[in-house]
């Protein structure tokens, strides 16, 4: 997911996307703890997507949108 794509979404869509990613990250963390993690590369992708969403949300809050 690119930051430019995220900037086109409104705040509600960003919050929804963030919540989905956080849930997926939690599920992956549980799988890793149980030793059943199939795709460890997914961790870094999710973490970076979460950071991108939070960055866009912070940009908007600083700009006063």
Swiss-Prot record:
Annotated family: Belongs to the universal ribosomal protein uL29 family.
UniProt keyword Ribonucleoprotein present: yes
Classification via SUPFAM superfamilies: Ribosomal protein L29 (L29p)
Keyword Ribonucleoprotein belongs to the record: yes
Keywords: Ribonucleoprotein, Ribosomal protein
Superkingdom of origin organism: Bacteria
Gene3D superfamilies: 1.10.287.310
Gene Ontology cellular component list: cytosolic large ribosomal subunit
Sequence intervals crossing the membrane: none
Protein name, entry field: Large ribosomal subunit protein uL29
NCBIfam families with a match to the protein in the record: L29
Gene Ontology biological process terms in this record: translation
HAMAP family, alphabetized: Ribosomal_uL29
UniProt GO molecular function: structural constituent of ribosome
């Amino acid at each position: 997911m690119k930051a430019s794509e995220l900037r086109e979404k409104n705040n509600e869509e960003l919050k929804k996307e963030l919540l989905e990613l956080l849930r997926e990250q939690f599920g992956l963390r549980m799988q890793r703890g149980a030793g059943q993690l199939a795709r460890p590369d997914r961790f870094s992708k999710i973490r970076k997507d979460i950071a991108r969403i939070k960055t866009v949300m912070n940009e908007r809050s600083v700009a006063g949108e």
